[in-house]
Amino acid sequence: MPREFSLENTRNLGIMAHIDAGKTTTTERILFHTGKIHKIGETHEGASQMDWMAQEQERGITITSAATTAFWKNNRFNIIDTPGHVDFTVEVERSLRVLDGAVAVLDGQSGVEPQTETVWRQATTYRVPRIVFVNKMDKTGADFIYSVKSIGDRLGAKAAPIQLPIGAEDNFTGIIDLVEMKAYEFDGKAEEIAKEIEIPADLKDQAEILRSELVEAAVEYDEELMMKFLDGEEITIPELKQAIRKGVIGAEFFPVLAGSAFKNKGVKLLLDAVVDYLPSPLDVPSIKGVLPNGEEAERHADDNEPFSALAFKVMTDPFVGKLTFFRVYSGILTKGSYVLNSTKGDKERVGRILQMHANNRNEIEEVYAGDIAAAVGLKNTTTGDTLVDEKHEIILESMVFPEPVIQLALEPKTKADQEKMGLALSKLAEEDPTFRTYTDEETGQTIIAGMGELHLDIIVDRMRREFKVETNVGAPQVSYRETIKLPAKAEGKYVKQSGGRGSYGHVVIEFEPNVDKGFEWVDKITGGRVSKEYINAARVGLENALTNGVVAGYPMIDVKATIVDGSMHDVDSNEMAYKIAASFALKEACKKMNPVILEPIMNVEVTVPDEYYGDVMGNISSKRGLIEGSEQRGNAQTIKSKVPLTEMFGYATELRSFTQGRGNYTMIFSHYAEAPRSIAEEIIKKSGK
């Protein structure tokens, strides 16, 4: 079956924003205009097409990235709708990894908000080209120029408007296109019929100034045009579009559009901008990977190259079972064929291939380079795994996910719930790499850990709804960590003789702090003093030992371990003995390494009316918070600070009470830092160590 849409006419894009910027409504309008839905669902009515999980419809927020395929003016869009709540940044992270471009939606009244900064940073990490849609221009207090300025001020990004709104708030009626210097007025109906009008006289001067600034900014990305511009020649409209496109594709320049998705104004022009400025799979750099021999290699967006893809999301569908979402980077995949999971070394059969519209499924025969689809039948594939043609092995760059910062204990309500709970938790952990579950060895309780209170609320809710498991939930606890402050060298020896075959394991390991780099293992054993299989066993044993720190039993992080020596016994050596020996070496070394407890520190931004500014500053300081600065926004103040997570439980209620419900805050994980002695002593006391 031949490809229906060329690669040039394909766009893989994400819609990203702060919670409540109107992102899901914008996506709804896009799906309406691209012919995917025939009745628009409003988020505040709980009827949105993309928010298809029951919890999303109740809470009016987007939790999982629903992937959908849509069509616009002979172009195919694969759209990923991503969540705007900080507890779900993993969803944003994994979407950005497989996208070629994104639309960042801002609230026209607030401009750049804290979660916008987080998502923007993630997009910058993956060098994702972006265009910006300033939404809610009909809202009281909407200010387009302020919003554009906030992109430069708060994100340090080079942005310029390519549109100018006509009016604002209730008087927002249309848009001036600064590239073509045309003005449009909207009728406000769902079809978004735009009538071309004269540029209003009171905006003509401003539009001309903004256009000349746009031309000046855009020609920087095209040398030939720069020369033409400096020679005083006229830059044509196609040339200007080409220069803007170059700047966008390089993730260096960010054009800004205006509109109101809810009031049906400006979304069709946004779709045109996606085609004009965001890249096709051919415009972005080829994906890199590693061959079995360790050499670096690339895969290009080409149907004739060997098949390679990255699994970026796993979820359980009530009708078809396990669904694995994947992005094809090269080649073609046909349903019913076998693929190699090169990350795990497993061969798997792709039963069916589905293209998704929110949670509706269309079965397709083949999927091509540059496409996004979901596979049924992959049993062992998880997020971040590479899928390839088994004759052409490669492992593509994977994804890195943050550690959970909050945990709580779960107890099943009945015996029947207990039997189902284990299965439910393992399925949910398979879907979400930032969700962990384990059994506390001392209490026997089941512990779940995640990125925030809302994250864990939704996990518990999903267990009840999807798996019919009722649980009692304990109070949230902070996920502390441990680390070392000094280097040390230690020997670990495990020898057991009990008649017949014994056990023998012996290693010498050098440990040192590895700040912010996680666990690192280095093998410096020479001359075959310890065989490779026993060295690997020592590594596994050490990693297991690190999950239970010596200070208070919390996982130890940021440790570099170098195995430098050891010995073997011809008969008695076995893998288990080396696992135990490595754990002994760690225990011995910890006596000299000054192990300490780390606590999660959060970036906290509080926005309050001016009259509460002093109260909030005092309150944050009383929570061991470090105030980093404040910013005036209208008649409100935004205070930026870093506060230990343990001090932030119940803060929503606290803030509500002393600001009469007029304050709000956002909290995002920043880093782990050493806990003060008094706090550490309290933690150790509670742990019973």
Swiss-Prot record:
The yes or no answer to whether the keyword RNA-binding is present is no
The record lists GTP as bound by: 17-24, 81-85, 135-138
Which keywords accompany this UniProt record? Answer: Cytoplasm, Elongation factor, GTP-binding, Nucleotide-binding, Protein biosynthesis
Superkingdom, taxonomy of origin:
Bacteria
Query: Which PROSITE patterns did the record assign?
Result: G_TR_1, G_TR_2
* Major location (coarse): cytoplasm
Location of the tr-type G domain: 8-282
Q: Does the keyword Plastid apply?
A: no
Location comes to: Cytoplasm
Q: Which SMART domains match?
A: EFG_C (SM00838), EFG_IV (SM00889)
Q: One GO BP annotation here?
A: ribosome disassembly
State the signal peptide span: none
Q: Which GO terms describe its cellular component?
A: cytoplasm
| GO MF entry, a single one | GTP binding
Q: Which CDD domains match?
A: EF-G, EFG_III, EFG_mtEFG1_IV, EFG_mtEFG_C, EFG_mtEFG_II
Q: Which family does it belong to?
A: Belongs to the TRAFAC class translation factor GTPase superfamily. Classic translation factor GTPase family. EF-G/EF-2 subfamily.
Query: What functional role does this protein have?
Result: Catalyzes the GTP-dependent ribosomal translocation step during translation elongation. During this step, the ribosome changes from the pre-translocational (PRE) to the post-translocational (POST) state as the newly formed A-site-bound peptidyl-tRNA and P-site-bound deacylated tRNA move to the P and E sites, respectively. Catalyzes the coordinated movement of the two tRNA molecules, the mRNA and conformational changes in the ribosome.
UniProt-recorded name of the protein = Elongation factor G
What is the source species? Mesoplasma florum (strain ATCC 33453 / NBRC 100688 / NCTC 11704 / L1)
